[in-house]
Each structure stands twice: as C-alpha cells, then as structure tokens.
Amino acid sequence: MTRYSSKSWRTFQPRTAAGAAGAAAAGPVAAPAPSSISLVAHDCRVLGLDPGSQRTGYGIIDCRGGSERHVASGCVDVVGHDMGVRLQRIYAAVSALVVEHQPDSVAIERVFVHRNPDSALKLGQARGVALCAAASLGASVHEYAPRAIKLAVTGYGAAGKPQVAQMVRTLLLLEIKLAADAADALAVALCHAQTRRLGALDAIDVA
C-alpha cells in the first residue's frame, strides 16, 4: 500500500561514539495529525514498540532509500489499573496502531534479565500482549537487543537514555520533546530501518 508525506526526509546513518556525545494516551490511540499525510511514496513503514507494565511507548517512521521520516509517536499510559486491564489496554492500543498505520514491520526491544522477578514477569506479560496484537494482525515482528539499538542510533552500545533521545530527535528532525518511552520506541524503529537497509536482518523473527 503506497503512502505519501509532505515532511522532509533525513538520511539516517550510524553515529560514532564521538559524534553521539555531541503525550500520554490512556484509551484508544488517536489518529495521526493531518500533517503526517504523505506526498512522497515510501518503501517501508516501521512501528517501534517499547512495552512496559505502566506505559508502552510507540514510534512510527517511514523509510525511503536511506532516509527516515517521523510519522507518529507517543505513549499508552495504563498506570492505576489492575494488571488484567493494563494488558487489555496495551493489546487494544497496539492493535489500533497496526490497523491505523499499517506498518510493514514491527520492531520491539528484546527482553533483558531483570533483577526484580516481579518486574520481569510484568514486563514479559506486557511484551507478550504487544507481540500477540501485532502478530495476530499479520505484521512482521522483529526483536533487537538493547545494545544493538543504542549502537545503531548513537554509535555507542552503552549510551544513556538522554543521549539516545537526543539522537532520535536529531535524526528525525524533531523539535518537540519526546517522552522517554516514545523516544525508546522510535530508537527501536530506527534500528530496524538501519538493519533492513544494510541487508543484515539478524533480529529474532517472532512472527
């Protein structure tokens, strides 16, 4: 399906370590603003997800050749609800994003070992429903290690969250401040775009 956009494109390239040094939604996910409607056909649309038991970040980018453009991003806030309701809302929100934006690929951060067993379990549940929602709608789902994501965006695998967020804004020409979870989700999407472009899709395919 061809989509179009009026926003400018930005070439996305891996950053060196030296160079790198330099709105919540609790219900249905809103449709993108009219300004995100396209005038230039793109090759691939990627939905990046940063699932969590309290809030889930999402970021959508369009890729054309060696360039990426921001389409939409934000957070699904489920704080204050029982776990069952949280998971249902995450599932519904991810499903709505896939239906609304029709991504060609969905990218998600690979789970890491957590010191707190209870937190690890809740994170796993949130990731599970997000993956299930995307896969059940036929999306191609890929996982990336946290270090690989940081390396792709900043050129430094141990970069901190502020550094990653700043590079995401720079690469996508964003003047707005991003919520931490939304920035992380966009970073995952950019990592997938770079991996796809390099022809080295070594992420773990889960769908």
Regions found by a protein language model. Give the residues of each.
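Phosphate- and other anionic-substrate recognition elements at nucleic-acid/protein interfaces
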Residues: M1-A207
